[in-house]
Each structure stands twice: as C-alpha cells, then as structure tokens.
C-alpha cells in the first residue's frame, strides 16, 4: 500500500505518528503542515542523521529542533564483521538499553534483520535472546532507524530486504512494529517494497489473524520447531497458550486471506527434533501448497542444545521433500560474531566502542 496503510487507516498522517515530538515543535511555532513532510522525507527518505543535514528547513527551525528533538534516537556503538561478510550492529537507545541488528549480504541482496524489543519475553529454550527476559518495547523510530543506520553504513549498496527476526516478539509490540514497517514501505519514506519485508512470530494466533487482514503485502514466518504438541511446549512456552491445532487454523486463515506463501521456521536440534518421524509429521501438518518449511541448523548458544550434523540436516531435508514438502535448508551466517539466528543477546554491550 503506497500511502502507508491508508495514512494509518485514515487516522493521523504517518509522518505525525512516526515523529510526534517534531510535530509538537512545529505546531508550537505555527509552521505550515508541509514542514513535517519535509522532516519526514529527510530522516526516513534521505537518511539524514543530523539536523544540519536537513537543508530544506530554515536555519532557525533546524537550530530549535536540534535543541529539543534528537535527529536520531539510536546511538551506533559498535559494528562487528564476520568472515562471511555479515555485520552485527550494537545500538544503544537514549535510555541506555542495548539492542542488536544484523546485515546479511547474499549475492545481489542485502538483508537487514531488525529487533522490536529490548530482550524477549517468550523464553524459547534454545534462544539466547530469550535468556535476557524483557526490558521494554521499542518505539517505531527505534525499529526503523536500525535500517536507516545500516543503509548509511553500506552505501552506495542498498538495503534490499528487511526481516523482523532479531530481538523480541514483534507481535507483542504490534502497533509500533507495523508503524515502523509502514515507514520502511512508504514511498515518501524508505520506499522498500512490502514484498521485501518479512515478520517472524513465535505463534501469537490472534495477531496472525490480524496481520492477515492488514492491507500491505508483508510476508509472515511462524516459528514452529516441532510438529509435536508436548515437545513444542517444552521448547516454546508460548505453545501452552496457542496449541498447534489453533496455530494451524490461524495459518490456514492467513494463506486463504492473503494468497501469499507462509513460511515455517524450524531450528534443527541434535537428538531433539531432527528425526525422520519429525519430517514425516511435518509433511502431514504442512499440507498446503502455500506452506514452505525453512530449516536451519542450531547456532550455538549456552542453552544446553547442540546442532544437528550437516549430514543429518541434509537427510532431513531430503526426506521432507520426498514427502512432498516445499522446504529449504538455510545456511547459518555470522556465527563467529554471534550474529546468527537465536544468538542475539548484546553480550558485547560493555565492550569498548569499535568500528
């Protein structure tokens, strides 16, 4: 949807929702409405990181904004670089919380994996982020600015894809997450096509249905990790509230409502969920032409689990495909800097600043 969720569903303009402090300053000064659009275009479109870069504003207004409203709400403290080209960004919020973001280079693609919460309350037993607990939700600017900062860092290369698969459960911060994604999608903002943006959830059924009803064509991924109910409850506490039959009803609603492919994430844990009976049960559970299984070998965290061998993972993939499943085995990226899936925990938040 071009005009940002029909201007936040016919409410306030997206620029005002995204920049309420700026809107307040402009209103106090009696500035014309187009000033807010200029600021929004400069920060979200041109990626200005300071008020002195917003040349479209009068000098006096730039000076007042500089004294009252931060041009950026995140401080980039550290960039770590992996051998495979992956980059991990350590940011601090203005109230001192650490969050992490990852950029994954693949041929012609540059994918940014962003966070939506400080920590995560879901407590998935194999995920380092879940060990942190939850501090607070991120605001829309804090979510979107992760992408802006990465875009500035990798220029002249461009961010081609955004995945909401970093720290936190995005559907527990639904409003701010959707607002940030609309800024990223908005042609007056970051101008990234909706089909290049994907959100991952641990399986909040009511929000899956709500997401299916949104006008934008964002993609969705559901963290599944096992087809067996009791095992899923042990791995993912959320399963106690949203059992697999309920989850699959929501999944069916999503694909029938949107006619878009639905991705299921599956982390292979050695001796836990990597047996052939799991592949066979998955083939029965994911029996829909729009379902796709993304397999990923476990990335080390100090949670007591270990990774399925590469050979076993390939056998699992082959069996799943033999049974008719659309499935992919995704490579792990950035493991040597703890930037891979499930590893984000801001462990180096107290390390010296480095670039």
Curated annotation (Swiss-Prot):
Keyword annotations: 4Fe-4S, Cytoplasm, Disulfide bond, Iron, Iron-sulfur, Metal-binding, Methyltransferase, rRNA processing, S-adenosyl-L-methionine, Transferase, tRNA processing
Classification via Pfam families: Radical_SAM (PF04055)
Subcellular location: Cytoplasm
CDD domains, alphabetized: Radical_SAM
GO molecular function: 4 iron, 4 sulfur cluster binding; metal ion binding; rRNA (adenine(2503)-C2-)-methyltransferase activity; rRNA binding; tRNA (adenine(37)-C2)-methyltransferase activity; tRNA binding
EC number: 2.1.1.192
Family: Belongs to the radical SAM superfamily. RlmN family.
GO process terms (BP): rRNA base methylation; tRNA methylation
Top-rank taxon, per record: Bacteria
Recorded catalytic activity of this chain's protein: adenosine(2503) in 23S rRNA + 2 reduced [2Fe-2S]-[ferredoxin] + 2 S-adenosyl-L-methionine = 2-methyladenosine(2503) in 23S rRNA + 5'-deoxyadenosine + L-methionine + 2 oxidized [2Fe-2S]-[ferredoxin] + S-adenosyl-L-homocysteine; adenosine(37) in tRNA + 2 reduced [2Fe-2S]-[ferredoxin] + 2 S-adenosyl-L-methionine = 2-methyladenosine(37) in tRNA + 5'-deoxyadenosine + L-methionine + 2 oxidized [2Fe-2S]-[ferredoxin] + S-adenosyl-L-homocysteine
SUPFAM superfamilies linked to this entry: Radical SAM enzymes (SSF102114)
Stated name of the protein: Probable dual-specificity RNA methyltransferase RlmN
Classification via InterPro entries: Aldolase_TIM, Methyltransferase_A, RNA_MTrfase_RlmN, rRNA_lsu_MTrfase_RlmN/Cfr, rSAM
Additional comment: Reaction proceeds by a ping-pong mechanism involving intermediate methylation of a conserved cysteine residue.
Functional summary from the UniProt entry: Specifically methylates position 2 of adenine 2503 in 23S rRNA and position 2 of adenine 37 in tRNAs.
Domain Radical SAM core: 106-326
Amino acids binding [4Fe-4S] cluster: 120, 124, 127
Any one of the GO CC terms: cytoplasm
């Amino acid at each position: 949807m071009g005009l940002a969720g029909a201007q936040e569903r016919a409410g306030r303009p997206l620029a005002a929702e995204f920049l309420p402090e700026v809107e307040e300053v402009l209103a106090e000064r009696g500035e014309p409405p187009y000033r807010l659009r200029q600021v929004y275009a400069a920060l979200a479109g041109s990626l200005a990181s300071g008020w002195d870069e917003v040349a479209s504003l009068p000098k006096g207004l730039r000076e007042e904004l500089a004294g009252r409203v931060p041009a950026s709400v995140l401080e980039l403290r550290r960039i770590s670089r992996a051998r495979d080209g992956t980059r991990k960004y350590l940011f601090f919020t203005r109230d001192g919380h650490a969050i992490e973001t990852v950029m994954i280079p693949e041929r012609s693609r540059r994918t940014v994996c962003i966070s939506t919460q400080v920590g995560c309350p879901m407590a998935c037993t194999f995920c380092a982020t879940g060990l942190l607990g939850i501090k607070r939700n991120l605001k829309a600017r804090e979510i979107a600015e992760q992408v802006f900062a990465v875009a500035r860092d990798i220029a002249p290369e461009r961010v081609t894809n955004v995945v909401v698969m970093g720290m936190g459960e995005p559907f527990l911060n639904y409003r701010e997450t959707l607002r940030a994604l609309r800024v990223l999608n908005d042609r007056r903002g970051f101008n990234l096509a909706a089909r290049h943006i994907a959100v991952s959830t641990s399986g909040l059924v009511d929000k899956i249905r709500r997401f299916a009803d949104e006008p934008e064509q964002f993609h969705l991924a559901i963290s599944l990790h096992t087809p067996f109910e009791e095992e899923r409850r042990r791995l993912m506490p959320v399963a106690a509230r949203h059992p697999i039959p309920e989850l699959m009803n929501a999944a069916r609603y999503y694909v029938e409502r949107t006619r878009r492919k639905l991705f299921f994430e599956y982390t292979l844990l050695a001796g836990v969920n990597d047996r052939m009976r799991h592949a066979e049960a998955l083939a029965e559970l994911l029996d829909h032409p729009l379902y796709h299984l993304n397999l990923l070998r476990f990335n080390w965290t100090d949670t007591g689990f270990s990774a399925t061998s590469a050979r076993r993972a390939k056998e699992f993939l082959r069996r799943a495909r033999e049974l008719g499943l659309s499935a992919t085995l995704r490579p792990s990226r950035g493991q040597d800097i703890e930037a891979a899936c499930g590893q984000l925990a801001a462990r180096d938040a107290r390390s010296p600043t480095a670039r």
